[in-house]
A protein has these predicted regions:
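Flexible helix-coil transition and linker loops at the boundaries of alpha-helical arrays
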Residues: 241-246
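Nucleotide-sugar donor-binding/catalytic module of glycosyltransferases
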Residues: 1-231, 240, 293, 304
Length: 305
């Protein structure tokens, strides 16, 4: 929070979304609000997920541009907002990306070699934006929402495209991928900077996963939400790619690569129904590669067994 408050570009609003927290977060936020009238608190009555919370924050914002920041990350410099605002205005940008460093919470050490970035500064304009996004591995840096300065009008267009049906799902993972996929597909101009403006903190397992029964159950629930969120992204990926052979083939490849080969919890009984539904959506896509089709059919047979 201090890294936001201490920015030398002061004409900002700071919107904090409380997604049904059970700790003393509200108390801390209210103390901050007493000292800084730019802070606005929005509370979800119950946990609604990160996709819903982020879109709610955007809908309640007033500025021309928006950024998101996870609760445990920070900005690396106090002139980040001023640099990004001036660049976006100068080039009339819809999206402006930048680099992020990765820091271990245990060591507090920032390794300049351990960062997420494109290696050079460049500007691209439509139609090359959507081509770039689909053709690189969409798990990588291009999908981190916190690494972009975004024109609000573009974000509102994406929210409208998603509609209440998707936004109201309790999506608690892959929300950045969903949003960046649609933002990239609808942006008219994008610039990437190689400057490191953002720090991502990595928490060791002993802080995030407890061996206690209670926390083991919570972790399993997290796994379930993660798989359900990816299924939603897979559905969106297929729905919003262009109706041509190349794009649909790429969408299918991403689905296969992520869900079958990386997702370890897709046999959970409560999401099998959704898994089968999404698999059938891909099977009914006439542009799906034969190898992908065979892999999905084989997978569905395993589920039946």
């Amino acid at each position: 929070m201090r890294s936001v408050q201490n920015q030398n570009f002061t004409d900002i609003e700071i919107i904090i979304i409380d997604d049904g927290s059970m700790d003393n977060s509200i108390k801390v936020i209210k103390e901050l609000m007493k000292e800084d009238n730019r802070i606005k608190l929005i509370r979800n009555i119950e946990n609604r997920g990160t996709l819903y919370s982020k879109t709610r924050g955007i809908l309640n914002s007033k500025g021309k541009y928006v950024m998101t920041l996870d609760h445990d990350d920070l900005y690396a410099r106090n002139n980040v907002f001023s640099i990004l605002f001036n660049e976006a205005e100068k080039y009339n940008l819809d999206l402006l990306g930048f680099a992020s460093n990765i820091c271990s919470v245990e060591t507090k050490y920032l390794n300049r070699e351990n960062y997420i970035s494109y290696l050079k500064t460049f500007i691209i304009k439509k139609p090359n934006i959507k081509k770039r996004f689909l053709n690189h591995n969409i798990k990588q840096s291009g999908t981190l929402l916190c690494m972009y300065f975004i024109k609000k009008s573009l974000f509102l267009k994406v929210i409208n495209l998603l509609g209440k049906e998707f936004i109201n799902r309790n999506i608690d993972a892959h929300d950045d991928t969903i949003l960046m996929f649609l933002l990239s597909r609808n942006a008219l101009s994008l610039k990437h900077l190689k400057d490191i403006f953002h720090v991502i903190f990595i928490w060791p397992k002993k802080y995030s996963i407890s061996l206690s029964f209670h926390h083991t159950i919570k972790f399993k629930e997290r796994e379930r939400k993660n798989c359900y969120s990816f299924l939603t992204f897979s559905e969106i990926l297929l729905l919003f790619t262009e109706n041509n052979k190349n794009d649909k083939k790429i969408a299918s490849n991403h689905f296969i690569q992520w869900y079958f080969k990386i997702g370890k919890c897709h046999y959970k009984k409560d999401i099998i129904k959704d898994t089968v539904r999404i698999c059938n959506l891909y099977l009914n896509n006439k542009y799906i590669a034969k190898s992908s089709k065979n892999e999905i059919l084989s997978y569905l047979q395993c589920l039946k067994n």
